[in-house]
């Protein structure tokens, strides 16, 4: 498959299948969903809600969540952005970071 916004968004439909692979009844402190671009398109809150609805976990994170929090924690204002994503994804990511108050 090609990397497209449509294919990345469709990952949401397979979360339940993937999450069913975790040991039933096991409690996790944190689960990380490792697809930055899908997290952007699906939405960080939606990713967290889906994971928490299928797995006993305290926290859910994504690379996007971590990057946003880290940039805020170090007081970043002006950031350079380099990413291996298709332009549609890169633009959306830049818009999100700008909405967070960063200058790109």
Q: At which residue positions do the language-model features occur?
A:
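N-terminal glycine-rich anion-binding loop in soluble enzyme alpha/beta folds
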Residues: 1-17, 82, 88-104
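Gly/Ser/Thr-rich loops at beta-strand to alpha-helix junctions
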Residues: 35-45, 84-89
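Phosphate/pyrophosphate-binding loops at sites that engage ATP/ADP/AMP, CoA/4′-phosphopantetheine
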Residues: 18-27
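Short Gly/Thr/Asp-enriched flexible loops that form oxyanion-binding sites at enzyme active sites
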Residues: 40-52, 94
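Ligand-binding pocket scaffold of soluble enzyme catalytic domains
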Residues: 1, 26, 33, 67-69, ...
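Short, acidic/small-residue loops that bind anionic groups at enzyme active sites
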Residues: 48-71
